[in-house]
């Protein structure tokens, strides 16, 4: 199964970032599963941009970045910064959640299609049931893929999915660099090779970013200690506890989750992560 192999690779390769983002999600008391949304958006790659202009791990459009005060300059594009993009994306998702009456399905749809389009669809349809709204197929499948991902993670054994130990991979930290944002200066001060510094910080289009101050710099603190004998799957599942999602993403009987009425059934989705679906390519 190509999708399963791809997901396993991306989970393993993205584990350091997933752990860090989950901490930010938890600090905001948001559903833990949101830490995996960049898997749908960008396969958790920091350095990608779509032909539509969305960039970074959270695929933020320029207007959204501006709205949440992310700097975008020739020398520095904060949409590629894991800390800056995560802060903006979670702020946006939190706002959407409140705007749509604490409905996560509508919030996710609006993250993909824009709140204006989703609000118009709700008003026109006279219902908040996502699957009854006139929305682009891409948006409906976007939400369905996220629900499918939640199910895949929750039922890994059933789908022959091998989950990596939660503490696998490198440990990343974020340091605030006071004053002018010079990745080169930081790397020289810390004795870090520039290519290693750039690997975690693709927001820097140039080694220095004049006009940008107090920027977050991501760095690796090396690998994790050897895993204990504790069941790694249990550790992973606990860390992304789907219980925190309540009804919105568990496909239990709840308002707005009658997917059959919207003629979208997860069982019929042969490509839950959208790997074979035509959409704007991600460019390095």
Stretches found by the model and what they are:
Residues 47-69:
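Short, surface-exposed glycine/acidic/tryptophan-bearing loops
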Residues 16, 32, 59-63, 67, ...:
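Generic alpha-helical secondary structure signal
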Residues 31-38, 55, 103-109:
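Alpha-helical scaffolds flanking conserved acidic
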């Amino acid at each position: 199964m190509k999708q399963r192999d791809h997901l396993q690779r991306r989970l393993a390769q993205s584990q350091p970032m997933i752990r860090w983002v989950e901490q930010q999600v938890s600090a905001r008391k948001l559903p833990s599963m949101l830490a995996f949304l960049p898997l749908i958006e960008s396969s958790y790659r920091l350095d990608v941009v779509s032909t539509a202009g969305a960039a970074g791990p959270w695929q933020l459009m320029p207007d959204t970045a501006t709205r949440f005060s992310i700097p975008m300059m020739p020398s520095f594009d904060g949409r590629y910064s894991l800390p800056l993009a995560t802060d903006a994306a979670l702020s946006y998702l939190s706002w959407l959640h409140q705007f749509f009456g604490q409905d996560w399905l509508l919030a996710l749809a609006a993250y993909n299609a824009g709140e204006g389009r989703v609000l118009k669809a709700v008003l026109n349809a006279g219902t908040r049931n996502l699957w009854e709204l006139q929305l682009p197929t891409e948006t409906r499948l976007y939400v369905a893929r996220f629900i499918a991902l939640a199910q895949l993670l929750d039922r890994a054994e059933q789908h022959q999915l091998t989950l990596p130990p939660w503490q696998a991979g490198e440990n990343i930290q974020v340091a605030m660099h006071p004053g002018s944002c010079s990745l080169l200066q930081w790397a020289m001060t810390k004795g870090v090779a520039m290519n290693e510094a750039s690997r975690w910080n693709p927001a820097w289009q140039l080694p220095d970013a004049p006009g940008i101050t107090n920027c977050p710099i991501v760095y690796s603190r090396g690998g994790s200690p050897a895993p204990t004998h504790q069941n790694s799957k249990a550790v992973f599942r606990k860390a992304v506890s789907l219980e925190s999602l309540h009804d919105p993403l568990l496909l239990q009987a709840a308002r707005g989750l009658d997917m059959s009425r919207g003629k979208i059934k997860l069982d019929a989705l042969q490509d839950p992560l959208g790997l074979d679906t035509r959409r704007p390519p991600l460019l390095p």
